[in-house]
């Protein structure tokens, strides 16, 4: 059965450590020089959403140290600060918060992926580890990004801390991607196993992520605003690192500090639609029957301040600024790139051909037929924030190199048994598209990298290609089509030109989905 490639939990890169692009090469070709600049842009995007800088931009203390400012809100500090967190990037976020606010912190509890502290220590990322005498207790769980008993114990500790708070207290909540699996708290008498079984049955029958989240929230004590309700009447400040397109607060980690807008009737409609209502465990029926209304209604979240402190759009904005410093005409195309990787690759390939023609030809010579195809493909991808026409106009007016940036999370349907990830597969497919016809007197480079530093079950973040990929691969007797058919992009890039096209970042400590760069440099 086809399944979407998933990015595995991965984290942590010291901001000062440079990215590496495979083994050293004897000489720096023009393509490698262009790739080095693209690397700098990717580096800047990831650096902008590192835990330390994010927290420092968001939190500040007044000179007396007795007031905490969060954006334009101020909170009094008087031995009343507590902290909880859950997610793949939360260990580094907690370390940064502890560094800034540790003297005011009474107690903290965080739930992080199994093995993360050992991985951080092994990588030498000491700045992302809590100090030995920190007041923050760390629970590791959710092995393979699945809720388990360890994560359940962490959720119970977080709930107990929240329920002890008073109106004089302030709770700082740290949230990142992966937080849902790290905060399992089914409403009794529903068990963790029963909730997981129901979720798996829904997924197997084709339920959407939105439908799955609706069911999860209805059966959870902490999701869908449940954590905010548990902490009431304390003030709650939730700092959120978004790994979801559009940054919907109710979706990230299933919205523990955001009031749910779904009712029990919505849940029953979903269960009926997938033919599961009659087969529900008695415990689930009990919970749904006694929930006459949404238990985490909007009236319970007036004491909460939710702040997105890191996102794909913030990362791309920084990369755009750095591109302009390097002399590029730079523009962000979209932060919502999604859909099947084949269609996304076709979009980028067609965009490259049209943009290259705009850059090197007069207005009268623009490829109108291909432009029409490009707009049609863009409409099929349904990218809500796509700035396509604006980008083409900017390219046509540009007098020098151009950099188009995008972000999001395409999906790969597995058909083979090879090794790779969505970023490497996208890069390889775009390389194939770029080789379909000459692009004129312009060098074109495409880069796709995961901001978490690990693309699928590999130790690289992604890869980059140029328009001569097909001819260069043929010269090395590499049939890229065979690698694509087997979803074996990692093996291809390891073999191609000594692995120099792989993007090695190491563990980054953050995740705001993927970054795509399409770079044009007139010859």
Swiss-Prot record:
Q: Which residues carry this modification: Phosphoserine?
A: 60
Which GO biological-process labels does this protein carry? fructose catabolic process; protein phosphorylation
Quick one: a GO cellular component term?
cytoplasm
What are the record keywords, sorted? Acetylation, ATP-binding, Cytoplasm, Kinase, Nucleotide-binding, Phosphoprotein, Transferase
Q: Which InterPro entries match?
A: GK-like_C_sf, GK_N_sf, MOFRL, MOFRL_assoc_dom, MOFRL_protein
> Its domain of life?
Eukaryota
Instruction: State the Gene3D superfamilies in the record.
Output: Glycerate kinase, MOFRL-like N-terminal domain (3.40.50.10180), MOFRL domain (3.40.1480.10)
Q: Does the keyword DNA repair apply?
A: no
**Record PTM N6-acetyllysine, positions in chain:** 200
Major location category of this protein: cytoplasm
Which chemical reaction does it catalyze? (R)-glycerate + ATP = (2R)-3-phosphoglycerate + ADP + H(+)
EC number per UniProt: 2.7.1.31
Subcellular localization: Cytoplasm
Q: Which GO terms describe its molecular function?
A: ATP binding; glycerate kinase activity
UniProt cross-references to PANTHER family, sorted A to Z? GLYCERATE KINASE
**What family does this chain come from, according to its entry?**
Belongs to the glycerate kinase type-2 family.
Identification of the protein by name? Glycerate kinase
Please name the source species. Answer: Rattus norvegicus (Rat)
